[in-house]
């Protein structure tokens, strides 16, 4: 065979492998899929895994469930432990793929997630869950919201 014919054969083989990979990935994604809701504030981190509709709770864990002291609840360590606990329960119940939705307090509170958001996602992946997409669902005010305390602030 000439070099040109050999390259054509290799191209056909490689495209077939790519199609196979696509098909196997689609099969994996179509399996049991859930949503991992991560609420990360500066006081705590809550991981809540539900089915795709969001109506049925599959697993739940928070930083307060694994931390011994209140000051440790929002820490990255507590978030990782809580995410690993929730992921283990979800894997036992048959969830393999999760869509991650991160939420910060929002509104008139902070719009950025707390320190446990990133480590929680990392722990979900390490526990064996496949993360399909990551989305930020922090509630943002569309005007008409005012900080508590009024115009002159909180008088102590």
UniProtKB/Swiss-Prot annotation:
Q: Which PROSITE patterns match?
A: RIBOSOMAL_S11
Among InterPro entries, the record links this protein to: Ribosomal_uS11 (IPR001971), Ribosomal_uS11_CS (IPR018102), Ribosomal_uS11_sf (IPR036967)
Q: What keywords were assigned to this record?
A: Ribonucleoprotein, Ribosomal protein, RNA-binding, rRNA-binding
One Gene Ontology cellular component: ribonucleoprotein complex
Biological process, per Gene Ontology: translation
According to its UniProt entry, the function of this protein is described as: Located on the platform of the 30S subunit.
PANTHER family referenced in this protein's UniProt entry, alphabetically: 40S RIBOSOMAL PROTEIN S14/30S RIBOSOMAL PROTEIN S11 (PTHR11759)
Record's subunit section = Part of the 30S ribosomal subunit.
Family designation = Belongs to the universal ribosomal protein uS11 family.
Output this protein's name.
Small ribosomal subunit protein uS11
Its source organism is: Thermofilum pendens (strain DSM 2475 / Hrk 5)
User: Coding gene?
Assistant: rps11
């Amino acid at each position: 065979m000439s070099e040109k014919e050999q390259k054509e054969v290799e191209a056909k083989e490689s495209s077939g492998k790519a199609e196979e990979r696509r098909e196997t990935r689609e099969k994996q994604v179509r399996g049991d899929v859930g949503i991992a809701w991560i609420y990360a504030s500066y006081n705590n981190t809550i991981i809540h895994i539900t089915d795709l509709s969001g109506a049925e709770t599959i697993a739940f864990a928070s930083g307060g469930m694994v931390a011994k002291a209140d000051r440790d609840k929002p820490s990255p360590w507590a978030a990782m432990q809580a995410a690993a606990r929730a992921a283990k329960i979800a894997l036992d119940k048959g969830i393999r793929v999760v869509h991650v939705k991160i939420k910060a307090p929002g509104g008139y509170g902070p719009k950025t997630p707390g320190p446990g958001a990133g480590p929680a996602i990392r722990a979900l992946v390490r526990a064996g869950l496949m993360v399909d997409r990551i989305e930020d669902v922090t509630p943002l005010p569309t005007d008409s919201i005012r900080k508590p305390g009024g115009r002159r602030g909180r008088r102590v």
